[in-house]
Amino acid sequence: MLRTMLKSKIHRATVTQADLHYVGSVTVDQDLLDAADLLPGEQVAIVDINNGSRLETYVIPGKRGSGVIGINGAAAHLVHTGDLVILIAYGQMDDAEARAYQPRVVHVDSANQVIDLNADTSTAAAGTAGAPVPNPLADPA
């Protein structure tokens, strides 16, 4: 049996561009791809922290050091410039590998530059938690 496990995650990246008319994918700064051990064409889930949207696509490399996180194609209807997102890649592995595997968790600053790289999936990097996202259903009183 294979288990599907978290392989890598880029946590709380800021979307820098959204291009509805591009053919698809997400453009990611090559430095972030390297830090997260993501390959061009690799499948990722994108979770939008601002609005709760979740989608799947594949990555294409962006200019190294640019901080680019570009949402391309139809996904630009769901994820917008300035939104905070989490990019997640999963891997399939056998039971023994899954029990020993350490994911790559990349924390970035507001300019999408790496500030922490570890395997801890439960702790935010210092100073990155930010203000809570407002609940649109909450009573404004």
UniProtKB/Swiss-Prot annotation:
GO molecular function (one): aspartate 1-decarboxylase activity
Major subcellular location class: cytoplasm
Localization terms from the record: Cytoplasm
Pfam families: Asp_decarbox
Active site, per annotation: 25 (schiff-base intermediate with substrate), 58 (proton donor)
Details of cofactor binding: Binds 1 pyruvoyl group covalently per subunit.
Reaction catalyzed: L-aspartate + H(+) = beta-alanine + CO2
Gene3D superfamilies reported in the protein's UniProt record: 2.40.40.20
Pathway: Cofactor biosynthesis; (R)-pantothenate biosynthesis; beta-alanine from L-aspartate: step 1/1
Posttranslational mods: Is synthesized initially as an inactive proenzyme, which is activated by self-cleavage at a specific serine bond to produce a beta-subunit with a hydroxyl group at its C-terminus and an alpha-subunit with a pyruvoyl group at its N-terminus.
Pyruvic acid (Ser) carried by residues: 25
Positions of substrate binding: 57, 73-75
One Gene Ontology cellular component annotation held by this UniProt entry: cytosol
Keywords: Autocatalytic cleavage, Cytoplasm, Decarboxylase, Lyase, Pantothenate biosynthesis, Pyruvate, Schiff base, Zymogen
Cofactor(s), by name: pyruvate
Family label: Belongs to the PanD family.
Subunit structure: Heterooctamer of four alpha and four beta subunits.
Job of this protein: Catalyzes the pyruvoyl-dependent decarboxylation of aspartate to produce beta-alanine.
Name of the protein described by the UniProt record: Aspartate 1-decarboxylase
Species the sequence originates in: Salinispora arenicola (strain CNS-205)
